[in-house]
């Protein structure tokens, strides 16, 4: 069954750019739950430029749906995940200064690290997802590490179909008026 988990990082970006607590990420997450989302996803980064570690702790206290914490498994991140015990952790190999996640794990090269982390999270009943590029051997590597799920980096995906070759859509213009009935012949 497909489930929707909404990433609220951009809400935190707006809050942080304004200073203060508007918009309130906690209230936004609660509203998203009321609107029907199955979970909330956050990606705290070491520089705290959007979701902060305290946001994660506060979200865990109030959410009624799943919490998914994404991030690079640096020691402070691993400690946060073990403390908060979300439903899911998504391991992402992004650099601390990355604007966004732009490459997945090489699950073959990092197998020992990922297997060890997965085991630690499983001990706390935390589901593990691994962010990876789509080659089949990396997908198999994620399974071999014990991951329950995979988060695929779609930037690295090859096109799934040939380029779009249909003609471009016509501009939206009003339809011409219907033809007028002929005028009666003069007498």
Language model features with spans:
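N-terminal small/glycine-rich loop or linker at the start of catalytic domains
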Residues: 1-18, 95, 99-102, 114-115, ...
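Non-cysteine beta-strand/loop elements that form the S-adenosyl-L-methionine
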Residues: 3-9, 86-96, 147-155
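Short beta-strand segments at enzyme active-site cores
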Residues: 39-44, 90-91, 128-132, 149-153, ...
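Alpha-helix-loop-beta-strand connector modules within alpha/beta enzyme cores
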Residues: 49-75, 107-129, 166-187
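Histidine/lysine/aspartate-rich catalytic loop segments that bind and position anionic ligands
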Residues: 129-175, 179
């Amino acid at each position: 069954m497909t489930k929707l988990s909404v990433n609220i990082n951009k809400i935190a970006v707006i809050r942080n750019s304004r200073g203060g607590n508007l918009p309130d990420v906690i209230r936004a997450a609660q509203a998203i739950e009321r609107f029907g989302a199955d979970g909330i996803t956050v990606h705290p980064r070491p520089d705290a430029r959007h979701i902060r570690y305290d946001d994660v702790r506060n979200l865990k206290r109030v959410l009624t749906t799943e919490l998914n914490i994404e991030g690079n498994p640096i020691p402070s991140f691993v400690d946060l995940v073990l403390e908060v015990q979300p439903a899911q952790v998504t391991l992402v190999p992004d650099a601390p200064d990355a604007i966004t996640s732009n490459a997945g794990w090489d699950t073959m090269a990092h197998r020992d690290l990922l297997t060890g982390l997965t085991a630690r999270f499983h001990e706390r009943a935390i589901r593990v997802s691994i962010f990876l590029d789509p080659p089949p051997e990396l997908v198999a590597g994620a399974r071999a590490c014990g991951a329950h799920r995979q988060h695929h980096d779609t930037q690295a995906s090859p096109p799934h179909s040939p380029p779009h070759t249909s003609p471009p859509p016509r501009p939206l213009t009003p339809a011409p008026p219907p033809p007028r009935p002929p005028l009666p012949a003069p007498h």
